[in-house]
Amino acid sequence: MFRGPLDTPWAADVSPSGPRGIKAGRSALLVPILGSIWGAWRPEPGATRYRTLDPMAAVRSSSRLTPFSIQAILNRKEERAHTFPRLATAVSPACCWRIFGESEAEGLGSPCGGAPGAGAGGEPSGWDSDSALSEEGELGRPGDIGERKKQRPLEARAKGEDEEETPGCSDCEIGASVPDPSPPDEDPKCEQLMLEPPKQRKKRSRAAFSHAQVFELERRFNHQRYLSGPERADLAASLKLTETQVKIWFQNRRYKTKRRQMATDLLAAAPAAKKVAVKVLVRDDQRQYHPGEVLHPSLLPLQAPYFYPYYCALPGWTLSAAACSRGTP
């Protein structure tokens, strides 16, 4: 029998023969190693487990293995809360889910969970520690959650006061600030504008030229379509007109002449009517009908009576007359 550091009996059959002896030899090699690991991990009988304020010791302890039991995990969280009291007090019960019906008024009244010096033992039994924020540094700065909770009621109060002060204006001030919703037709100024007749646009008076002036302008235009400045001034002075009147008359005359020329060109470009030679069938000196043939409508010889079934209806139409007309050219 071999006993390890913890006085744990380890049964090892060390007989060298057979497969059982080989397995026993392997177990004999593993027993000292496992025993040394267990001896290093087991705490001393009188020592307090991880109840230290040294942060490095807490970090070292966090790297060790933890038994997979709910009670061990909860104890580990409580130990970390004792190790870092500042972080434990920063966790607000108002941030966690409440499973035992803790009132919202108490959570708002004490957002930080009591005095700053209170430890994890002072936490109410109503909130679940597993539903708190993560322990890996997601809490943020201490006191931020409490400050936000305090600021929310203050902001609500400030908004309520602003809403109360806004409608505090008197009815006169509101009436003065709001424009009159009445339509513009009711305004007296608008009524006056509607009653007044619309102002007609003042037409520019056309210059009335005398026959002598028009004759002289046309003669000069046929001779010279464009006038220079001195020539225009000389012509205006001789006709007792202004230079602007002479200038406008020449412009209008050039425009009319151009339009007439374009119309003439279009008519000239149109294809002329084609003349077709027609054979003359009737001449002026030839007589078409004889005096006795006017009563008879047909001049062609009749071959048989059945070609003309209605010959009996004609007055004076007989076979003898038809036979006589057969010999006419």
UniProtKB/Swiss-Prot annotation:
It comes from the Eukaryota. GO terms for molecular function: DNA binding; DNA-binding transcription factor activity, RNA polymerase II-specific; RNA polymerase II cis-regulatory region sequence-specific DNA binding. Residues 110-124 have a biased composition (Gly residues). Keywords: Developmental protein, DNA-binding, Homeobox, Nucleus. InterPro entries: HD, HD_metazoa, Homeobox_CS, Homeobox_NK-like, Homeodomain-like_sf. SMART domains: HOX. This is Homeobox protein Nkx-3.2. It comes from Xenopus laevis (African clawed frog).
